[in-house]
């Protein structure tokens, strides 16, 4: 499925395209996001936040969220808040969700309490966001694009994996090696 929208902020005109890819048997979705500058001047400081204000998965609304990266095909929690995290693991003992990007511009952030996405995720610096927390909360991913010249575009890919805890890490490794 492809969704395309056009927006104007101030004097900047841009087009956003989101492509969803999922097979009938997969337990993950691939999202491709693209921003195209359809205006006449450079698009600067373009940012995207993706995430949720409520981390409910399976039958639980209080989940453990950990920021990390994929190391040798497996999730590895980051050692400090200042370390870039491109993967979020959300688990409740039975179910697991992985939310991640392959983009070097992506940063997992948020991990706040349940509530307004703008205040709980968008206003949270990835460099100071908690690394590991258990709560009824929100989370997100932040990307700041390079400046985009008129007629040019920038894009990135992100993944949402949902499975049982027993099979989630193997699925993450398979998706990561295919990415």
List the predicted regions and their residue ranges.
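Extracellular adhesion/glycan-binding regions together with long Ser/Thr-
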Residues: 2-4, 121-150
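Residue-level detector of intrinsically disordered, flexible termini
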Residues: 80-84, 126-128, 167, 177
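Generic surface-pattern signal
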Residues: 113-116, 122-127, 176-177
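Short Pro-Gly-centered flexible turn/kink motifs
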Residues: 146-162
């Amino acid at each position: 499925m492809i969704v395309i929208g056009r927006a104007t902020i101030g004097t900047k005109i841009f087009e956003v395209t989101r492509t969803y890819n999922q097979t009938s048997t997969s337990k993950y979705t691939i999202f491709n996001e693209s921003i195209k500058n359809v205006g006449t001047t450079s698009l600067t400081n373009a940012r995207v936040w993706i995430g949720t204000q409520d981390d409910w998965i399976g039958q639980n609304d209080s989940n453990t969220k950990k920021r990390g990266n994929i190391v040798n095909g497996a999730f590895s929690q980051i050692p400090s808040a200042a370390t870039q995290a491109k993967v979020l693991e959300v688990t409740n003992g039975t179910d697991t969700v992985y939310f991640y990007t392959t983009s070097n511009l992506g940063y997992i952030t948020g991990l706040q309490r349940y509530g307004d996405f703008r205040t709980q995720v968008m206003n949270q610096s990835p460099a100071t966001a908690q690394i590991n927390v258990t709560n009824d909360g929100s989370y997100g991913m932040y990307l700041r694009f390079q400046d985009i010249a008129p007629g040019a575009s920038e894009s990135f890919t992100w993944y949402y994996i949902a499975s049982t805890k027993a099979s989630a890490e193997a699925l993450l490794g398979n998706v990561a090696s295919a990415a």
